[in-house]
Amino acid sequence: IAGMDRLVRLNVIAKSGRAVEAAGDVHVLLLDKTGTITFGNRRCTAIHPAPGVSAKELGEGALLASLADDTAEGKSIVEYLRELHPMVEPNVATLTPVAFSAETRLSGVDYQGRIYRKGAVDSLLAFIDVKRTDLMPALVREVEKIAKTGGTPLLVCVDGKLLGVIHLKDVVKP
């Protein structure tokens, strides 16, 4: 049990004490992350507002930035936020979608003259012309905590104002 507890602290999952004992004899480990032990797609599990931003403001901004996002991650953000922060949603036809691309690593919408975006930390910071060293310490800590636990942090902004962080993670199957 003590060995399993130490592994959990390092984000390693062991299903039995025998597995922990056998791991002592392992010299090479090859992992196949295709959904064997997880559902295989990252899901939104939390949002963390920036200092001075309410959870409602972040939730609405992240929801709008995700409404036109057809990816599994985008759909999970919408699903999560519809429960957490219900709001009157605009008709998707009134949104101008900005699709995710590997080059920009951003997505979002333009709606009623406002620019809603979410994306990878470095990409979103470049989009709003903010250096990583100028990022609020509270957001830096949250981004690092999410990444350290194996999650994916996404920053959210509206009209260049950082609203906070979305926590995406691959959920382990029961």
Label every model-predicted segment.
Residues L67-E73:
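Short glycine/threonine-rich catalytic loop with a Thr-x-Gly-x-Asp
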Residues A22-D25, E73, I77:
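General structural feature for long, well-ordered alpha-helical segments within catalytic domains
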Residues E73, L81-P174:
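Signature of the cytosolic headpiece of P-type E1-E2 ATPases
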Residues E57-G61, S76, A138-R141:
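Long, highly charged amphipathic alpha-helices
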Residues R42-R43, I77, V121:
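N-terminal sensory regulatory modules of PAS/LOV and PAS-like folds
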Residues I1-L67, P86:
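Conserved catalytic phosphorylation-site environment of P-type ATPases
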